[in-house]
Amino acid sequence: MNKSYSLREIVSTLGGELLGKDDVLISRVASLANAQPGQISFLTDSKYRSVLATTNASAVILTPQNRDITALPRILTDNPYAYFAKVSDLLNPKPEYVAGVDDTAVIAPSAQVPASCTIMAKAVVGANVVLGEHVVVHPGCVIGEGVEIGAHSVLHANVTIYHHCMIGERCNIFSGSVIGGDGFGYAPEEGRWVKIPQVGRVVIEHDVDIGANTTIDRGAIDDTIIHEGCKIDNLVQIGHNCRIGAHSVIAGCVGIAGSAVLGKHCRIGGAAMILGHLEIADGVTVSPGSMITRSLMKAGTYTALMPFQSHDEWLRTAAGIRRLGELAERVKQLEKQLAPQQVSGIQRDK
């Protein structure tokens, strides 16, 4: 059951400026449209002002510029969305794990597992693994030989961490993810493929979240590196030798081919594709569904996707695109034909 906090307690803990009654109790967060008494919401987009006028929320979070748009008790802050996230975290504390090792877990004798760790049923911790304080390993996880995991990190059910990978502190890796499987490396020889041993690691720095069923391949020679603060959604594939810059976010179903390098604070929309060996500058946003086929050396938003149409309209558009080369050639020929006439006309004018 959620614990309730007064607005006064919330502001005392998280900061911000409080207007209105300070003893209002808040037990949950909610959207403006669905909020009920005892719940708090937020407003950042002016198009939802009409919803604010009819909300049943007991309080709202606003920017200082919007301080007078409602009579509801309100907390003023420069970033209402981030403040809302912090309130939600306050009202929904993380579960308290009981330290210890389940009887069905398998722990190698050489593994270093502090007494503060929680190792749940049927987890496997391999030889020479080093776990930090308060690491939580949920049921069915497999941690390979020589893996290091920093303090307060959590592996959810059925996560696999392959040998010698490194996970930083306060990381969350959700169910079904595989860290450090072999990269897709094969050399052609006489019509066959020769497997290239993948001898690098995956190195994940502090404060990284990795969604369910995401795969991050180990490097062929150099390490695959996910820098601090990155947030990666479900069903993402990151190829071998990639480097993802600090505090970048990658939405679901993205594929990043091997040896691509993303800068800091990049935003990659869902189902986007980034080809291998490309470099993406700091601060780049890639729109959902886009295919990036060349390096992007300047911050900004990039889109490589045809907007949707009805099927018949799309067929006509596609047919037109296929004819662009032909049309360009026809225009070029027409320009050549017109050029002598234009010169002749100029001479007559003289």
From Swiss-Prot:
<comment type="function">
    <text>Catalyzes the N-acylation of UDP-3-O-acylglucosamine using 3-hydroxyacyl-ACP as the acyl donor. Is involved in the biosynthesis of lipid A, a phosphorylated glycolipid that anchors the lipopolysaccharide to the outer membrane of the cell.</text>
</comment>
<dbReference type="InterPro" id="IPR020573">
    <property type="entry name" value="UDP_GlcNAc_AcTrfase_non-rep"/>
</dbReference>
<dbReference type="GO" id="GO:0016410">
    <property type="term" value="F:N-acyltransferase activity"/>
</dbReference>
<dbReference type="InterPro" id="IPR018357">
    <property type="entry name" value="Hexapep_transf_CS"/>
</dbReference>
<keyword id="KW-0441">Lipid A biosynthesis</keyword>
<dbReference type="InterPro" id="IPR001451">
    <property type="entry name" value="Hexapep"/>
</dbReference>
<keyword id="KW-0012">Acyltransferase</keyword>
<dbReference type="Pfam" id="PF04613">
    <property type="entry name" value="LpxD"/>
</dbReference>
<keyword id="KW-0808">Transferase</keyword>
<protein>
    <recommendedName>
        <fullName>UDP-3-O-acylglucosamine N-acyltransferase</fullName>
        <ecNumber>2.3.1.191</ecNumber>
    </recommendedName>
</protein>
<keyword id="KW-0443">Lipid metabolism</keyword>
<dbReference type="GO" id="GO:0009245">
    <property type="term" value="P:lipid A biosynthetic process"/>
</dbReference>
<feature type="active site" description="Proton acceptor">
    <location>
        <position position="240"/>
    </location>
</feature>
<dbReference type="InterPro" id="IPR007691">
    <property type="entry name" value="LpxD"/>
</dbReference>
<comment type="similarity">
    <text>Belongs to the transferase hexapeptide repeat family. LpxD subfamily.</text>
</comment>
<keyword id="KW-0444">Lipid biosynthesis</keyword>
<comment type="subunit">
    <text>Homotrimer.</text>
</comment>
<keyword id="KW-0677">Repeat</keyword>
<dbReference type="Pfam" id="PF00132">
    <property type="entry name" value="Hexapep"/>
</dbReference>
<dbReference type="InterPro" id="IPR011004">
    <property type="entry name" value="Trimer_LpxA-like_sf"/>
</dbReference>
<comment type="pathway">
    <text>Bacterial outer membrane biogenesis; LPS lipid A biosynthesis.</text>
</comment>
<dbReference type="GO" id="GO:0016020">
    <property type="term" value="C:membrane"/>
</dbReference>
